[in-house]
Amino acid sequence: MHYLNISFSHKNSTLDVREKLSYKDDYATKGCLSKLNSGESINESILISTCNRMEVFCSCSDIASATKHIFEMLAARSGVSIDELEGRADIFDDSSAIHHLFSVASSLDSMVIGETQIAGQLKDAFRFSYDNGFCSQKLARAMHHAFKCAAKVRNATDISSKPVSIASVAVSKLKSVLDNVEGKKALVIGVGEMSEITAKHLLSSGADVYITNRTKHKAEKLASECGAKVLDMQDLHKAVNEFEILFTATSSSEPIITDEIIKPCDFDRYWFDMAVPRDINYHKGDRINLYVVDDLKNIVDQNMSFREDGARKAHGIIGRSTVEFFEWLNTLNIEPMIKEIYEKAFEAARIESQRVIKKGFIPKEYEDQIHKMSQQVLKRFLHQMSSKMRSVSEESKADMLTSAVQFLIEKDQRDIPDKYKCEHALNIIEGR
């Protein structure tokens, strides 16, 4: 079994390419995962699709075959040629795939180092795949340790001491190009985490914030939580020509702001499109200053400089965690564990046989017979247990079983995973 990761991110792919590769809804994601797992060499898969990356993480029996299948599937859907995809993609296998996963979970591979959104996005991607039957034991093991590694990085470094995200960087960019945000009308389109962060940053800067969404009650809920106002989505065509500031981050698969609704204005407009695929599609002009996620690189570079020391320390933690993960995997082999159980049982029988002979309870001439009989008794007793252990070794509950047995036979096994819902993910993201 191998781990494989194929990554398209802000590091190797333009926004245009990432748009074509993106998966914006559950239906499309489920279809992708189903096609991935239909490959003869792929047995589990997770799809991560955000504004800055689209990645396939899978377990497979053959790396070359799985890689070919993934590129063919992505090319057929996106319209991007296989040659271009192969030229852009970062491909990681086995230990490098785990190292990359840990880096992503710890936000070391993010455009904004230390940003807090990627952990939640990764958690959601894993939960969706797991709940729909596209991943199980092998990827759950890796995800469990990825979130455990992210917790170590968060606790041992300062890269997340001042939480940032693409949304907060976008608001910082706005404040750098607009002298004063206070009192200015700002429209936030969408109600996801990025929209919520944007609205809160704008409000804290004194902007007059309105929130709109296709589902009005969701906009009302977010506006109530933030202290913002609500704009009916039906009035979007008017708002784009009235608001000086606009941020959009929806999950729409098509642009929601196009040339047809944009009219000339006598004031400058500052628009931030943080969606992938993009929400705004228009021809330049009309005093509109449009920024997309890839335009925020300068601020991101400053962020990287500020967090450089913490990032170096984090890379060390990730390296050690990768080694520890594979060491842990090696302990999960069921056969050495069964062998050790038998050896401990036979040794206990031998010691006890010698004790009763030494005390004269049994004549010494019967020593061989007693030894053989005790071994036969133990073999009969342990046979059913060892058979059950072998039968569940490939099931999703295997790690719980092996960890518990390791604990009982006095191995150093401090981390006993409770289940494959990956409690580390929930604990880290929800702060429990």
UniProtKB/Swiss-Prot annotation:
UniProt name for this protein: Glutamyl-tRNA reductase
InterPro entries on file: 4pyrrol_synth_GluRdtase, 4pyrrol_synth_GluRdtase_dimer, 4pyrrol_synth_GluRdtase_N, GluRdtase_CS, GluRdtase_dimer_dom_sf, GluRdtase_N_sf, NAD(P)-bd_dom_sf, Shikm_DH/Glu-tRNA_Rdtase
PROSITE patterns for the chain: GLUTR (PS00747)
UniProt GO BP: protoporphyrinogen IX biosynthetic process from glutamate
Keyword NADP part of the UniProt annotation: yes
Function: Catalyzes the NADPH-dependent reduction of glutamyl-tRNA(Glu) to glutamate 1-semialdehyde (GSA).
Keyword presence, Oxidoreductase: yes
Site (Important for activity): 100
EC number annotated for this UniProt entry: 1.2.1.70
Pfam families in UniProt: GlutR_dimer, GlutR_N, Shikimate_DH
Protein's pathway: Porphyrin-containing compound metabolism; protoporphyrin-IX biosynthesis; 5-aminolevulinate from L-glutamyl-tRNA(Glu): step 1/2
Subunit structure: Homodimer.
UniProt binding sites for substrate: 50-53, 110, 115-117, 121
Annotated family: Belongs to the glutamyl-tRNA reductase family.
Name of the gene this protein is made from: hemA
GO MF term set: glutamyl-tRNA reductase activity; NADP binding
